[in-house]
Swiss-Prot record:
UniProt KW keywords: Amino-acid biosynthesis, Aminotransferase, Cytoplasm, Pyridoxal phosphate, Pyridoxine biosynthesis, Serine biosynthesis, Transferase
The gene coding this protein: serC
Gene Ontology BP annotations: L-serine biosynthetic process; pyridoxine biosynthetic process
Function: Catalyzes the reversible conversion of 3-phosphohydroxypyruvate to phosphoserine and of 3-hydroxy-2-oxo-4-phosphonooxybutanoate to phosphohydroxythreonine.
Gene3D superfamilies in the record: Aspartate Aminotransferase, domain 1, Type I PLP-dependent aspartate aminotransferase-like (Major domain)
Organism: Ralstonia pickettii (strain 12J)
Places the protein is found: Cytoplasm
Keyword Plastid: no
Record lineage: Bacteria, Pseudomonadati, Pseudomonadota, Betaproteobacteria, Burkholderiales
Subunit structure: Homodimer.
Protein name according to UniProt: Phosphoserine aminotransferase
Binding residues for pyridoxal 5'-phosphate: 117, 167, 190, 213, 255-256
Cofactor field: pyridoxal 5'-phosphate
Length: 378
């Protein structure tokens, strides 16, 4: 049986997984990992068994760095860091590395709050200095991103923090916000749930970070991309393993990195290149999300509450107008091989996370089911 036949056989037993994270991975990647599980490239070792200092893993790591830089067109004056702890840890790591950049005596940062994750980010940052809420959409239930013209930014803030795709509520910045980066303002963004889904304007962001478990690979790996001149401002009490400068100087191996998660991420990077790169995936993601939103908008049975100008391409929350039918919807969806559609407990309803690895056929199957469920429920 050749690789294509094995992939076809495996696909026939798989479901369409709409989990928000950990999330669906490309089947090709899983098949390759399966083939290489016991002996990577004839080494006689699984990647999980390799020394992170050995030649084999050094090759894996170097390829992952190189491919990610190429895919996102990361400029040479930015450092790519492979870390651990997820975006939750970065909520502390960011202020520990940046908040004292302008003033050690009066550390300060601006935060734009557009959903659950940016709420958590600003709460954590308050442990390390003053936080100014430059804008928030909380009074609108986070259904819309505040217009940039309304943001109240501080002249003495070390950085502006955003979450450019809020996984739970389903809002996404569709444009890079212009907040004066050309005049020295530093913009930091949590991109956990939409990294590699669209190109990045590096004039607009000086630090990006995200957990890998949504759009890159398995849980355990965190990626930060930091402009090099922003390294070296860490708080004296910042743990060494979370000091961006030390991590950069040690090639992301100051401590033992999450080797297998990096290996899988590297396979995903190669898969993205075979798909035509980030630009090709963006086109595909627009098609997938438009298909789902168009169906919801045309229906009197389902609804999406997010303002059309900032709907997420990755995370599509929706509700049944008759919410008493929600459990039946989920149960029948599972019977059709459509899983992990339940919305976050803080929001309710449903949520379809349609990351890069979700094929168009998965979204088509979901829409077909939603149409049929609406018909029989009418």
């Amino acid at each position: 049986m050749n690789q294509a036949d094995r992939a076809l056989q495996a696909s026939q037993a798989r479901v369409y997984n709409f989990s928000a994270g950990p999330a669906v991975l490309p089947l090709e990647v899983l098949e390759q990992a399966k083939e290489e599980m016991v002996s990577w490239h004839g080494s006689g070792m699984s990647v999980m068994e390799m020394s992170h200092r050995g030649r084999e893993f050094e090759n894996i790591l170097a390829a992952a760095f190189s491919d990610l830089r190429q895919l996102l067109a990361v400029p040479d004056n930015y450092e790519i860091l492979f870390l651990q702890g997820g975006a939750i840890a970065e909520n502390a790591i960011v202020p520990l590395n940046l908040m004292r950049r302008l003033s050690a005596d009066a550390p300060k940062a601006d935060y734009v709050v557009t959903g659950t994750w940016s709420v958590k980010s600003q709460q954590e940052a308050r442990k390390y200095g003053e936080v100014n809420i430059a804008a928030t959409s909380e009074t609108e239930r986070f259904h819309k991103i505040p217009d940039v013209s309304s943001w109240k930014l501080s002249s003495d803030a070390a950085y502006v923090h955003l979450c450019t795709n809020e996984t739970i509520v389903g809002v996404e910045y569709q444009e890079t916000p212009d907040v004066g980066q050309a005049h020295g303002r530093v913009v930091v963004s949590d991109v956990s749930s939409h990294i590699l889904s669209r190109p990045i304007d590096w004039n607009g962001y000086q630090v990006l970070y995200g957990g890998a478990q949504k759009n890159i690979g398995p849980a355990g790996l965190t990626i930060a991309i930091v402009r090099k001149d922003l390294l070296g401002h860490a708080h004296p009490l910042c743990p060494s393993a979370f000091n961006w400068r030390l991590v950069a100087e040690n090639g992301s191996m100051y401590n033992t990195p999450p080797t297998y998660a990096i290996y899988i991420a590297g396979l995903v990077f190669q898969w993205i290149k075979r798909q035509g790169g980030v630009e090709a995936l963006e086109t595909r993601n627009i098609i997938k999300s438009k298909m789902l939103y168009d169906f919801i908008d045309a229906s009197s049975f389902y609804r999406n509450e997010i303002h059309p100008t900032c709907r997420s391409r990755m995370n599509v929350p929706f509700f049944l107008n008759d919410e008493s039918r929600s459990e039946a919807f989920l149960a029948q969806a599972r019977e059709r091989g459509l899983v992990q559609l339940k919305g976050h407990k803080s929001v309710g309803g449903m949520r379809a996370s349609i990351y890069n690895a979700m094929p168009l056929e998965g979204v088509e199957a979901l829409v077909d089911f939603m149409r049929e469920f609406e018909r029989v429920s009418a």
